[in-house]
Amino acid sequence: VMVVCPLGVKQEFVVKDGPRLGMNYRYVGCDADADKALAETPFLITNYERIRDGQLSERWIQANISGICLDEGAILGNLVTKTQQTFTDILSEIPYRWVATATPAPNDYRQLIYFADFLGDGDAGLSLTKWFGRNPDKAGDLQLMPHMEREFWLWVSSWALFVNKPSDLGFDDKGFE
């Protein structure tokens, strides 16, 4: 299993969250690092640039990783970025994919479309034309069509999970406030 996150976030997994959950994460920056780390733990962590720029190769990832979590998934927020295209190409064959984000960009539901595209739950181009229309007040902007809103949220609820607080998952909210 590999977590992919911004470089500044990796220590949260390695030092804090991983040990608390009984997971021994190892940071990897290239195929050789990953081979060594897999001898010690099944929990790997890297940053987006290592995959995007090829230090962790497509061949290695597809041969060794069965589950991947993109932390701070807003990195997928645009169809024309090198990161989004690379991740879709390289990681689409990983059987278990998960995208985590504190929140999609405020009022930009298109990010949910990009997440679904990465997860294999919908083609971003088709989804954008199905549920979104041009904003007549702002050039180049799309907005969720009001008559499609219910259908859009039903579709999102078929593949997404929204968690607001620990009790949403059956845990105590004490200390969360």
Give the role of each language-model region.
Residues 15, 20-24, 39-40, 67-68, ...:
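Conserved P-loop NTPase motor "coupling/switch" region that bridges the ATPase
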Residues 32-67, 78, 82:
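Conserved helix/coil segment N-terminal to the catalytic DExD/H
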Residues 7, 48, 72:
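Residues immediately flanking
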Residues 1, 34-37, 59, 88-90, ...:
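Short secondary-structure boundary/capping segments
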Residues 2-43:
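Conserved nucleic-acid-binding Ia/Ib motif block in the N-terminal RecA-like helicase ATPase lobe
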Residues 9-10, 50-51, 104-105:
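Alpha-helix capping/helix-boundary segments
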Residues 3, 7, 169-175:
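Conserved strand-helix element at the start of the C-terminal RecA-like helicase core
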